[in-house]
Amino acid sequence: QNVQLLPGKSYTITLKFELGVQLAANDINLTQNGCTASDKNNLAKLRWATGNLKSTGNTNYVWTTATDRGYYYTFYSTYTGNTNTNNTDPCSKLNTAYYGTGWRTPSRNTLAMLSRCTNKALINKGMWFMNSSIGLFLPAAGYRNDNRGGSGTEATTGPDTEGYYQSRDDAGGTVSYFMLLRNGTAEIQAYQKKDGKTVRCVKGD
């Protein structure tokens, strides 16, 4: 649509942009792990951060680039630098001036849907979900075992070969749900809340 701007007039142009990855259902073509039509339709409603969380403290969080590992967070907690948890969604701390609002740590069910829509192939130290060119790339960032410090900035176990992505759902007792990825595997498991795992934020979940 062409708009004619007249001399002597004042105009305001408002630009709206959405950060993140969101695919239409018919673009979700990685179905080798049991991805269903329902999974595709539900995933199409979500927008994903393009990188893992990479911030310390408790305010103005950012996410990193798509291939960077980011930092490691205990279950449903902002960055603590140790094995403590604080019952705070770290995705809620993303800088709203830049990213907007509504970001959350994914639910167990959302990560389960995502885990089904992949070819389970580890490539370039990570795994593609939904689509291998325009989909979601999750680095195999490893994790931080709780006896090696929990939350922190560097992996202690499995970097480049495994990924451990936090959900926001408690599995009871000392464990919580997360998504595990390694070559040939993408699935939901439950493990220690005190471990440091990566976080990929989502909107619409």
Region spans (language model):
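Extracytoplasmic cysteine-anchoring/structural motifs
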Residues: 1-38
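Generic structural signal for short, flexible, solvent-exposed coil/loop and linker residues
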Residues: 4-6, 42, 154-155, 190
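Extracytoplasmic/periplasm-facing segments of secreted or lipoprotein envelope proteins
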Residues: 41, 47
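C-terminal, surface-exposed recognition/capping segments
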Residues: 50-60, 65-75, 83-89, 93-104, ...
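Extended carbohydrate-recognition surfaces in non-catalytic/accessory domains of CAZymes
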Residues: 78
